[in-house]
């Protein structure tokens, strides 16, 4: 009965052009009320409050703050200069610089969003100016920023460690080698694509 009601409510909401996320939320709330009454609201509030009181979660806003401070202080440009000295001489150097800088920035901020915000506004226009296609520049920037999920200190790793009751330190150690390997293969792919297209 509950499943049939959920399905019907979702179809009705979607047919009257309610956004999918809101439709799913309303459907879920109706199903919870049908199944348990309104007591789930109190339980949900308690669980959310208890979940927010975990000590490792304090690191998340601090990593975001550190990334914001570094961006406003101009550290992004210094990281780009350092990466340029390391890999800028290779064919497709600007895409290599993009990937290396994203890896360095991921090691500092732990956030893929902060990585894209700090480096994308600098590197994408620079890559376009050097003749890289805009889609390629955006793809390199976004894919290299996704390494921040793997390279420690990673915000998703902290959240996972809290939820799974795992060791944050062990997860960070486990992310080093895959992050470096992922960065290497991204650089290899960027090099091959640069040979073909640029």
Task: State where each predicted segment sits.
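Alpha-helical transmembrane segments of multi-pass membrane transport proteins
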Residues: 1-196
């Amino acid at each position: 009965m509950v499943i049939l009601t959920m399905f019907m409510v979702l179809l009705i909401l979607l047919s009257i052009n309610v956004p999918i996320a809101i439709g799913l939320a309303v459907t879920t709330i109706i199903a919870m009320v049908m199944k348990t009454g309104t007591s789930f609201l109190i339980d949900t509030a308690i669980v959310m409050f208890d979940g927010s009181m975990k000590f490792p979660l304090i690191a998340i806003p601090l990593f975001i703050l550190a990334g914001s401070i570094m961006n406003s202080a101009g550290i992004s440009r210094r990281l780009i200069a350092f990466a340029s000295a390391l890999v800028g001489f290779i064919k497709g150097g600007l895409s290599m610089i993009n990937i290396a800088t994203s890896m360095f920035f991921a090691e500092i901020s732990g956030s893929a969003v902060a990585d894209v915000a700090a480096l994308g506004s600098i590197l994408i226009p620079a890559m376009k100016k050097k003749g890289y296609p805009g889609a390629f520049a955006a793809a390199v920037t976004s894919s290299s920023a996704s390494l921040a999920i793997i390279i420690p200190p990673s915000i998703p790793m902290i959240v996972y460690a809290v939820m799974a009751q795992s060791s944050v330190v062990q997860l960070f150690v486990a992310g080093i080698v895959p992050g470096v390997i992922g960065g290497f293969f991204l650089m290899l792919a960027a090099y091959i694509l640069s040979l073909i297209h640029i």
